[in-house]
Amino acid sequence: MGIPLYPPGERLRRLGEACELIKLLWTQHTADFDGRYYQLKEARCEPKPVQQPYPPFVIGGGGEQLTLRITARHADVWNFTGGAVETFQHKVRVLHEHCAAVGRDPGEIELSVQVPVDYADLGATVQTVQRFVDAGATHLVLNLRPPYPAGIVARLADEVVPRVRAVEG
């Protein structure tokens, strides 16, 4: 396709720089930027986003050295892409350390979690949701994996969503 696939560390550094660049484009009439990977001179981005100051930045992943540091600097939402509640709690602590290092209130970052749906036991899914909410999750994504059982979306709407809303309070 002609699009280079950079090594993981470089991809993440490019992401961090791109976040800076995009925020400039969305908040200034013209933007100048001279980064390691991207350069702009008197660049414009029109029309500006309707959401002010700009749409939320969502960053997912759990890499402690780069991803969570970039999240601390730029994200409005961090998405924990899966794993145990204890791993989530550890990653949140690391994120808070990165926030402290850049002078940011970690409470400004919404904590999103992807929760795998247990098709055989939807009650177990609700219990998992409860554990993540108790651990500080503020946003939940019910993660459906193929093969999808017939009627699963309706079952989730009827059996899980009302109970999840009750958990979220």
Model region roles, listed by residue range:
Residues M1-G169:
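Active-site-adjacent structural elements that line small-molecule/cofactor binding pockets in enzymes
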